[in-house]
Amino acid sequence: MEKVWLKRYPADVPAEIDPDRYSSLIEMFENAALRYADQPAFINMGEVMTFRKLEERSRAFAAYLQQGLGLQKGDRVALMMPNLLQYPIALFGVLRAGMIVVNVNPLYTPRELEHQLSDSGAVAIVIVSNFAHTLEKVVFKTQVRHVILTRMGDQLSAAKGTLVNFVVKYIKRLVPKYYLPDAISFRTVLQKGRRMQYVKPDVINTDTAFLQYTGGTTGVAKGAILTHRNMQSNLEQAKAAYAPLLQPGRDLVVTALPLYHIFALTVNCLLFIELGGRSLLITNPRDIPGMVKELSRYPFTAITGVNTLFNALLNNEEFTHLDFSTLRLSVGGGMPVQKAVAEKWETLTGKHLLEGYGLTECSPLVTGNPYDLKHYSGSIGLPVPSTDVRLRDDDGNDVELGKPGELWVRGPQVMLGYWQRPDATDDVLKDGWLATGDIATMDEDGFLRIVDRKKDMILVSGFNVYPNEIEEVVALHAKVLESAVIGVPNEVSGEAVKVFVVKNDASLTPEELLTHCRRYLTGYKVPKIVEFRDELPKSNVGKILRRELRDEEVKVGTTDAA
C-alpha cells in the first residue's frame, strides 16, 4: 500500500526515525539521568524524586538483584504495583541488571497471577503489601524464589511515609493479612544494594526488555516479547509525531494510567524520561476528587488517558476551574475517544484531545492524530513514522482506499513474537507483518478508522477482556449449562461485559453468578449484565454464535433509539 499518509504529515514530522539511536534502554536511561540529574523525574503524593536519585536507587536495586539474589541476565522479574515511586526504581533496576520486566496488574486474582508468573518463568517479584495476600495463595506453585515487598509510603519522606503506611493499613484497612516469611523489604534491598557492586551487563538492542502480557482469542494471556529496540523505536516514533508540542527538560506529564499498562509505560515513562520530563504519578485514578486536587498543585503540560478518565474529569466541577494555560499535549488511547468527550475537552482546555491507536504487540503505538489537527476527526489518525500498514480482505489481497479490510502493521515497534508460543506467533506474524484482527478503512489522506473488531475482544476502559476467559469461569458454576459473552456499549467504560446463560438449575440467580465471577476475575472482567435464555444461537456444527447475539443487541439498541 502506498504511504499516502506521508503527505498529510506536518512539515516538521519526519517520515522515518532511527530505531538504533541508543544501544539499549539502559544507555537511554543513563544518558537522561546524566543530562537532567538535578531535575525532578517523578512526583508522587507530594514527594519529588530527581533523576539523580532515580539513577542511584535503580543502580542499588540492580546491584542487589545481581549480587544479593544472584540473578542472571535474561531472568524474568515481575513488578506488581500501582503508580508509586518504587515502580520506576524497580523498572530501571531490572533493566539495568540485564533482566526482563514482567508487568503484572496488581488487581489480578490468584488464578490470573499464577498463570502469568508460571508462564513467564519469573524468578522474583516486586509487590506492594496491599496485594501480598494474592501472591501468598499461589507463589508456591510458581518458579518465584524471591519476593521483594514494599508498602505504599516506603519511598516518601520518613514522617509522611509512616503516616501513609499507617492510614493504608489501619484506617482504610487496605492490606489484608498475608504470610510471606521469606520476603525482603524494598528498603532493605536499596540499603544493601548501595554497598554492592553493580556490573553493567552486555545488553544489545535485540535483547528482550519486557514480556508484556496480553490476552488472546483463546482467552489465554500471552507474553508479547518486546525488545529494547522495539520500545526505543516506539519512544522515538511518539517523539517524532509530537515533538513540536514537547519541550525537553520542561514538561510535566500527568500519569493516571498505570505504568504496568503498555501505553503509560512507553509514553509517560520511557518517552518523558528521554525528554527529561517530570511524571506526576497518580496512585489511585478512581479517586477523581483526589486526582484533581493533585493536578491543581502542578502546571502540567501533557496528559494521557483513556476516554473514561477524560469523561470523569470533565464531569468534576473542580477540574473545570483548573488553569490549562500550560497544557500542550492531550492524548487518548486504549479505547475509542468519544466525540462528545473530545469536543468538551477542547472547549474547556482549548487543546485538542488527540486519539491514538496501538496494541501491546506494537509497543504499543501504531497510529496517532497529527498535532496540527484542527477538529475532532473520529479517526485513529495516521501511521506513526517508520510504520507501514496495509488493509487486506479475507483472501489476503490489499483493498482499495475507503474499503474495509483487516489492518496489518510492519515496523521496528512490532514484537518478536509470543513467549514460548510459536503457533500463536505464526497466527499473527507473517513476513514481518502483524495481523491486528481489527477491521479498518483508510481515506485518501491516510487517516484510518476502526470499523469493527475481527476478534471477539471486549474493550472495558482501555483494558482487553476476552469472552472465552469469562465463559470458562462461568462454566465452573454447577448451575450453568452453557454461556456466551459479548461486549455491549456503555457510556462510562466504552463497553461492558454481558453474559448470556442457559441454566442447568432453575434456582440460579444473577447475584449468585456474579458472586462466583468475582472470585476468579478482576473487577473490569466481571459481567455487568446477566441474561438468562432457554438456548443460545449456534452454527450447524454446534459452535455458539456470539455474532448473532451482538447483532441482536444492536437491533434492540436501534429499536430503543427509535
UniProtKB/Swiss-Prot annotation:
SUPFAM superfamilies: Acetyl-CoA synthetase-like. It holds the Pfam family AMP-binding_C. It catalyses: a long-chain fatty acid + ATP + CoA = a long-chain fatty acyl-CoA + AMP + diphosphate. It is found in: Membrane. Its EC number is 6.2.1.3. InterPro entries: AMP-bd_C (IPR025110), AMP-bd_C_sf (IPR045851), AMP-binding_CS (IPR020845), AMP-dep_synth/lig_dom (IPR000873), ANL_N_sf (IPR042099), ATP-dep_AMP-bd_enzyme (IPR050237). GO terms for molecular function: ATP binding; long-chain fatty acid-CoA ligase activity. Keywords: ATP-binding, Fatty acid metabolism, Ligase, Lipid metabolism, Magnesium, Membrane, Nucleotide-binding. It is an enzyme of class 6 (ligase). It is a peripheral membrane protein. Transmembrane segments: none annotated. GO terms for biological process: fatty acid beta-oxidation. Its cofactor is Mg(2+). PANTHER family: LONG-CHAIN-FATTY-ACID--COA LIGASE (PTHR43767:SF8). Catalyzes the esterification, concomitant with transport, of exogenous long-chain fatty acids into metabolically active CoA thioesters for subsequent degradation or incorporation into phospholipids. Belongs to the ATP-dependent AMP-binding enzyme family. This is Long-chain-fatty-acid--CoA ligase. It comes from Yersinia pestis.
